[in-house]
Amino acid sequence: MSAQKSPAELKSIFEKYAAKEGDPNQLSKEELKQLIQAEFPSLLKGPRTLDDLFQELDKNGDGEVSFEEFQVLVKKISQ
């Protein structure tokens, strides 16, 4: 997936993965892993781990990633 998607496309992709388990408006760590592996496969190559990325994105510390928190990742990728 290119980070150059419209906001509606990004929201749709987020919701597709978030709806797999638990809260359909939040990504669990497993859902985030599935999304990254399918949509951003090169993101976790190198020293960065899923745990590092999840901790960085989960700004409020609730153990899930909201769409707003996910947008931080998209912005970083598109730079």
Swiss-Prot record:
GO molecular function, one term: vitamin D binding
Modified residues (Phosphoserine): 42
Sites of N-acetylserine modification: 2
Positions that bind Ca(2+) 2: 58, 60, 62, 64, 69
Alphabetized Gene3D superfamilies for the sequence: EF-hand
Pfam families: EF-hand_1 (PF00036), S_100 (PF01023)
Entry keywords, A to Z: Acetylation, Calcium, Metal-binding, Phosphoprotein, Repeat, Vitamin D
GO cellular component term, pick one: cytoplasm
Domain EF-hand: 13-48, 45-79
Superkingdom of origin organism: Eukaryota
Sequence positions that bind Ca(2+) 1: 26, 31
Residues with N-acetylalanine modification: 3
Entry-linked PANTHER family: PROTEIN S100-G (PTHR11639:SF73), S100 CALCIUM-BINDING PROTEIN (PTHR11639)
Protein name as annotated: Protein S100-G
Source organism per UniProt: Sus scrofa
